[in-house]
């Protein structure tokens, strides 16, 4: 069954951490909807390898419209967490119990949303202390799945495992 996957993304996202999962989700028949401050805007990856035209504005969506949430890394999550609309969307999504996929710096939005206390996850090395300070149990491994809801990975090298577990939770 086709699922709708929300992606919170803005400029300087880690190119492959969006393109790889998005391609795999689409191949499995799922719909990927990109969300930023402004619909129709084009955002660029930090390596300049990918650009994405935003489908929806954060003001026109709610977590109830989606089946899963993807939080790619790079600088994008840090930029987005400065806007409470994205933090609230993330918090409400996690609290809904639906799958959330966060890689590299993606957990920065989870930290700002205060939803990882007592959860198991991994992330890129520079934010390990932030993950621990937010009350999560950190695991240095390619993919961590917590409560069959939260899938996290560290870097683009972990994308095969990240994509595999995300697709498993989507039922694909």
From Swiss-Prot:
Q: Which reaction does it catalyse?
A: N(omega)-(1-hydroxy-2-oxopropyl)-L-arginyl-[protein] + H2O = lactate + L-arginyl-[protein] + H(+); N(6)-(1-hydroxy-2-oxopropyl)-L-lysyl-[protein] + H2O = lactate + L-lysyl-[protein] + H(+); S-(1-hydroxy-2-oxopropyl)-L-cysteinyl-[protein] + H2O = lactate + L-cysteinyl-[protein] + H(+); N(omega)-(1-hydroxy-2-oxoethyl)-L-arginyl-[protein] + H2O = L-arginyl-[protein] + glycolate + H(+)
Q: How is its activity regulated?
A: Glyoxalase activity is inhibited by zinc ions at pH 7.0.
Q: Which InterPro entries match?
A: C56_PfpI-like (IPR006286), Class_I_gatase-like (IPR029062), DJ-1/PfpI (IPR002818)
Q: Which Gene3D superfamilies match?
A: 3.40.50.880
What domain of life does the native source organism fall in? Answer: Bacteria
As recorded in UniProt, its EC number(s) are: 3.1.2.-, 3.5.1.-, 3.5.1.124
UniProt domain PfpI endopeptidase: residue ranges: 3-171
Question: Where is this protein found?
Answer: Cytoplasm
- According to the UniProt record, what class of enzyme is this? hydrolase
Gene Ontology process terms (BP): DNA repair; guanine deglycation; protein repair; response to heat; response to oxidative stress; response to pH; response to UV
Q: Which sites are catalytic?
A: 104 (nucleophile)
Question: In terms of one coarse class, where is the protein primarily found?
Answer: cytoplasm
Which controlled-vocabulary keywords does the entry list? Cytoplasm, DNA damage, DNA repair, Hydrolase, Stress response
One example GO MF annotation: glyoxalase III activity
* Cellular component annotations (GO), alphabetically ordered: cytosol
Effect of a null allele:
Cells lacking this gene are highly sensitive to oxidative, thermal, UV, and pH stresses, but only slightly sensitive to salt stress and insensitive to cold stress. They display increased protein glycation levels, and decreased viability in methylglyoxal- or glucose-containing media. They also show highly increased DNA and RNA glycation levels, and exhibit strong mutator phenotypes.
Entry similarity comment: Belongs to the peptidase C56 family.
Function statement: Protein and nucleotide deglycase that catalyzes the deglycation of the Maillard adducts formed between amino groups of proteins or nucleotides and reactive carbonyl groups of glyoxals. Thus, functions as a protein deglycase that repairs methylglyoxal- and glyoxal-glycated proteins, and releases repaired proteins and lactate or glycolate, respectively. Deglycates cysteine, arginine and lysine residues in proteins, and thus reactivates these proteins by reversing glycation by glyoxals.
This protein's assembly is summarised as: Exists in monomeric, trimeric, and hexameric forms.
Record protein name field: Protein/nucleic acid deglycase 2
Q: Which organism is it from?
A: Escherichia coli (strain K12)
């Amino acid at each position: 069954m086709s699922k709708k996957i929300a992606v919170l993304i803005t400029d300087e996202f880690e190119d492959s951490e969006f393109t790889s999962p998005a391609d795999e989700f689409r191949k499995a028949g799922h719909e990927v909807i990109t969300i930023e401050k402004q619909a129709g805007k084009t955002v660029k990856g930090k390596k300049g390898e990918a650009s994405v035209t935003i489908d929806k504005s954060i003001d026109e969506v709610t977590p109830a419209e989606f089946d899963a949430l993807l939080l790619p890394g790079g600088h994008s999550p840090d930029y987005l967490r400065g806007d409470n609309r994205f933090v609230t969307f993330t918090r409400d999504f996690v609290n809904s119990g639906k799958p959330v996929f966060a890689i590299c710096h993606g957990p920065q939005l989870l930290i700002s949303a205060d939803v990882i206390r007592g959860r198991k996850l991994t992330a890129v090395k520079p934010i390990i202390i932030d993950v621990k300070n937010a009350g999560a149990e950190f695991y240095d491994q390619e993919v961590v799945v917590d409560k069959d809801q939260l899938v996290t990975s560290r870097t683009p090298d972990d994308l095969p495992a990240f994509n595999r577990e995300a697709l498993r939770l989507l039922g694909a």
